[in-house]
Amino acid sequence: MIQFTQKEIEHLRKKKNECPQAILRLEEEVKDILEEPLLIPKTGIGNWSLYYYCPDCSVKLDFNRHSPKAHRCPVCGKIWTGSPYYESWWWIVSMENYEAAFRMALLYQIAERKDCADTVSYTHL
């Protein structure tokens, strides 16, 4: 898919100097993906994020990229494990990967960040 024409890319590269905070924001949003190993499930797994809620308190569980099997409720503190929380955790990870891939593609095109292109290319394997 072609997101921008070459002319549009050149225009955006010129504009980045007028709005450096936009690039800084994109960089902050992809920081975890660039600094840590990319999380990709070995099998097709995932479930609606609507299941990532405490059934007792009806609030979204605290998401932690480093805790795929324990999911804490911010209200009652209970730790939820197993299905559907584990699968929903993977759905959230997959969405973060997707959003980060788009942002890294922008950083590559606009800020010419080759490290972002390398990471995005890896996600297509």
What role is predicted for each listed range?
Residues 1-125:
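Extracellular glycan-targeting catalytic surfaces
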